[in-house]
Amino acid sequence: MFFEDFDEKFNTLIAKSADFTHKPFLHSVVKINGEYERDNVDIDLTVNILCRDNEGKRLDIYDLELELFKSNSELVLVISKLNFPDEPILWSGVKTIWMNSSNGKKCSPPKYSSRLENLATRIKIFIT
């Protein structure tokens, strides 16, 4: 990735990926903590992906939290519904696993699983 303003472009790629996988909504990205630099092989970053309708009205029921980090040299994305802490969490590393948010054990995917799995795949493509 070759950007002049890397942080802004990186956030834009995440937002556009969410726009694509969660149509017809529009998304913005707010960094919560961590860093990711173009030339750095390490990543540890948490962002919120905020959702709006086409008229700009916030739709917080669709907001997401995205964590990106390396585990054993492999990129891992963890995606959860920001305002629904009891919903399953997507772990997308070498394998894709849905986890119960209360106990961390593997669980069945929710009905909206394909959207979040597609989002994770698109973001991984941009990063790797």
Q: Which residues are covered by each model-predicted region?
A:
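Negatively charged, low-complexity tracts enriched in Asp/Glu with abundant Ser/Thr
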Residues: 1-63
